[in-house]
Amino acid sequence: FTDCRVLEAVPDGLFDHATEAETFAYCFQNCNMVTEVPADLLYNCTKITSVGSLFSGTAITQIDEDFFSRNTELTDCSIIFSNGKLKTVPEKLFANNKKVTTFNSLFANTESFESVPAGLFANNPEVDSFRMLFSGTSLKSVPAGLFANNHKVTNFQSAFSKTAIQSVPADLFAGCDKVTTFMSCFTGCSELQSVPAELFKSSGAFTTVTKTAFNNIFKDCTSLTEVPAGLFDGFTLVTAFNDAFNGCASLTTLPAGLFATNTAVTSFTNVFKGCTSLKSIPEGVLGGLSKVTSFSG
């Protein structure tokens, strides 16, 4: 039914006999007149592994807590509700989907999405990627422990980019010690005012992050006023902080040892470009970084 823009309703029992179906990817994508779906639509489809983009671009405003409860073989739950109308989802929506490996762009660009329950991903221990998870939503806050049981995640790229969050809990990434990238994770969070010093260190991903894991990390966070000491401590393999604070127009102070342990860094391209409130750089902020070759921008 992809792009069926005149479809207004999904009838009860539509897939009751689709017991051998393995995927419903893109099934109702861009059916922008659909505002609701039967709670038991997929109850008999116990073999499906993918629901990627299932309701992307629809006008669904709520989803039943048990909607995916019988789809225990699901692995791909990416882009399900992107470009939609949801404001939130039930905490136990994915409680029975223990094999899911990707939630990429789950709510991306759903501007109405405002809140996420703390236990939404509590029963999804196999997840590998949350790339662009909430990107472009109106998410206002991040509950503590949101990723507490997702220790296999490698990708948080752009996960919270362009959201309305004002702060993040110190334990947000705690225990996620297989992360390879945080790139652009908070890019464009224009209301983000502060970040805790333990934010990245609590993950323990010191040996798994890629060389460019922090590029664009706080780019265009226009309300961020300060950076805590020790924020990047321990990440000795990182070689670039390109655009890390580019466009942080409210940033006024930096800790002297911000990059003290990042001794492999070679590039700081545009790292403080557009930081119009930053009047001075503390002595020694770049001390000991003998491998740096680029300060352009």
Where are these regions (language model features)?
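Solvent-exposed loop and capping/linker segments of extracellular ligand-binding repeat ectodomains
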Residues: 1-297
